[in-house]
Each structure stands twice: as structure tokens, then as C-alpha cells.
Amino acid sequence: MTKPADIRVKSADELGALLIDLRKEQFNLRFQQATGQLEKTGRAVQVRRDIARVKTILAERQRAAAPKA
């Protein structure tokens, strides 16, 4: 599980790479679940939430960088 504080210190490039890695892991976990090979079912939930955390922090940074109307 990745903590939000750990995610916030990373650069945008690092967050992008982390997001790609998490999505690949999520794909593999879904494939394992479909074939009945998934042992740690809770990991799928953790990965989904980590993806949401990364996307939330990226969105916060985009809103902060956007010019005020």
C-alpha cells in the first residue's frame, strides 16, 4: 500500500511510471482472478486504491498549475 505522503514527494514523471506499473499489475491480477490462480484477493483492492491515489494527486497538481479564471 502506497501512502499519499510517499506519492506526493514524487515527480510527475515518477508518478506516471508508477501509474503504468500499477495498471500492469492490475491487469495481471485480473487475469489471475479470471483463471482462478489469484491467491491474495486483497491485493487487487490495494492496487485499485493505489491507482486512485496516484490519479488524485496528479489531478490536484494539474488544478494547482492551471491559471485561475
From Swiss-Prot:
Pfam families found in the cross-reference section: Ribosomal_L29
Any one GO molecular-function label of the UniProt entry: structural constituent of ribosome
Top-level taxon of origin: Bacteria
GO biological process: translation
GO CC annotations, alphabetized: cytosolic large ribosomal subunit
Keywords, ordered alphabetically: Ribonucleoprotein, Ribosomal protein
SUPFAM superfamilies in the record: Ribosomal protein L29 (L29p) (SSF46561)
NCBIfam families reported for this sequence: L29 (TIGR00012)
Family: Belongs to the universal ribosomal protein uL29 family.
Designated name of the protein: Large ribosomal subunit protein uL29
Protein species of origin: Granulibacter bethesdensis (strain ATCC BAA-1260 / CGDNIH1)
